[in-house]
């Protein structure tokens, strides 16, 4: 990939515009989870250290384009960055027709989604953004799968377009896991529906040695294996699809193992009592919310012997502790494995935090949708743009 990396450039005195993913949860004007901000800080600090006049832009939430809405303002992010950085930080509301940016300070543009044409990748808007800088830095892997004015169009028109260290690191880690992985390659795909992750399952079943499915997705595979799933969340219309994916994996010497024991309850609630059952004993009234200890142990063994692990999605309703043991055991197995491991997606990162294994996972991806699209083998528009500008 012929992508220019920001770290290689001389930025002294240059106007540098960085697109970060600062889309963080905010409550009562305070940032409640700062993971994305912490991930973005090294890039911002590096640009400041290199003597640039640094401007940063991001979206936050889903406001109506063209309308200012205080609920989606980046002011709470500015407050956070002011404490995290040793330089002045200010919010710029009107910046499209020019903005003053000085070396030694950080200018944060107000929510890019307040601009009409952002989502449609409007060329006039992209050109206005490009005119504000000497160097455009795309560092937001979480939005690399969207061709929008601030993630794609601006890069086509800026004098120089490059990847920031965070984005470059994501691409390197994902490339290591997917392009030339140490074998066996094991992927864990959890989540509620097969339909939302069908293309990922399709793509992975053709390249991985073991594909572990969890959550509601696993229920469809349990049904496909001929077992009762009761009132569990599953997709009857995708049973044939599940059978085909299993056959596809097995034809390559791989497999999609189905749980042998499961944890069930009669209702979905934080106080529901958990019952352990053999998968053949599930009744029509049961709802499956987790894998049982035997299944978790078997999966742990697979993970222990893996060369590469890609994790996207929990294997149970881990938010409720009584249905979290399966995900906890998987998390521990990944932490104990010598494999190169990469974890991505919101629920997965919440599980990584809950079971405190962040420092034991080789790479934690900041992307949700972008992470999935990379696993599907899709071209990410922002990455394609950077490649075209790097040639």
Swiss-Prot record:
Pfam families: PGK (PF00162). It is found in: Cytoplasm. Substrate binds at residues 21-23, 36, 59-62, 113, 146. It catalyses: (2R)-3-phosphoglycerate + ATP = (2R)-3-phospho-glyceroyl phosphate + ADP. The keyword Lipid biosynthesis does not apply. Keywords: ATP-binding, Cytoplasm, Glycolysis, Kinase, Nucleotide-binding, Transferase. Monomer. PANTHER family: PHOSPHOGLYCERATE KINASE (PTHR11406), PHOSPHOGLYCERATE KINASE 1, CHLOROPLASTIC-RELATED (PTHR11406:SF23). Belongs to the phosphoglycerate kinase family. This is Phosphoglycerate kinase. It comes from Shewanella sediminis (strain HAW-EB3). The lineage of its organism: Bacteria, Pseudomonadati, Pseudomonadota, Gammaproteobacteria, Alteromonadales. The gene is pgk.
């Amino acid at each position: 990939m012929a992508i220019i990396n920001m770290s290689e450039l001389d930025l002294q005195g240059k106007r540098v515009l960085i697109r970060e993913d600062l889309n963080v949860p905010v409550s009562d004007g305070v940032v409640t989870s700062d993971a994305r901000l912490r991930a973005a800080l090294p890039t911002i600090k590096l640009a400041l250290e290199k003597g640039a006049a640094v401007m940063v832009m991001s979206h936050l939430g889903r406001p109506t384009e063209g309308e200012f809405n205080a609920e989606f303002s980046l002011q709470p992010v500015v407050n956070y960055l002011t404490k995290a950085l040793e330089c002045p930080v200010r919010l710029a509301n009107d910046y499209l027709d020019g903005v003053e940016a000085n070396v030694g300070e950080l200018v944060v543009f107000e929510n890019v989604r307040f601009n009409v044409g952002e989502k449609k990748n409007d060329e006039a808007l992209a050109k206005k953004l490009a005119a504000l800088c000497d160097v455009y830095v795309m560092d937001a892997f979480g939005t690399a799968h969207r061709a929008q004015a601030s993630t794609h169009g601006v890069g086509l028109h800026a004098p120089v377009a490059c990847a920031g260290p965070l984005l470059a690191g994501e691409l390197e880690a994902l490339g290591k896991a997917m392009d030339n992985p140490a074998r066996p390659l094991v992927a864990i795909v959890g989540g509620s529906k097969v339909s939302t992750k069908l293309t990922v399952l399709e793509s992975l079943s053709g390249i991985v040695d073991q594909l572990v499915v969890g959550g509601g997705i696993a229920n469809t595979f349990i049904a496909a294996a001929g077992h009762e799933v009761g009132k569990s969340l599953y997709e009857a219309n995708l049973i044939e699809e599940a059978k085909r994916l299993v056959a596809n994996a097995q034809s390559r010497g791989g497999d999609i193992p189905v749980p042998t024991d499961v944890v069930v309850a009669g209702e979905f609630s934080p106080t529901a009592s958990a019952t352990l059952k053999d998968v053949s004993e599930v009744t029509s009234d049961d709802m499956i919310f987790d894998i049982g200890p035997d299944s978790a142990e078997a999966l742990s063994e697979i993970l222990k012997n893996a060369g590469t692990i890609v994790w996207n999605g929990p294997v149970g309703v881990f938010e409720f502790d009584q249905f979290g043991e399966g995900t906890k055991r998987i998390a521990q197995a990944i932490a104990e494995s010598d494999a190169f491991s990469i974890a991505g997606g919101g629920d997965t990162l919440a599980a990584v935090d809950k079971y405190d294994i962040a420092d034991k996972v080789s790479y934690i991806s900041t992307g949700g949708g972008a992470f999935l699209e990379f696993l599907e083998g899709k071209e990410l528009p922002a990455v394609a743009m950077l490649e075209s500008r790097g040639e």
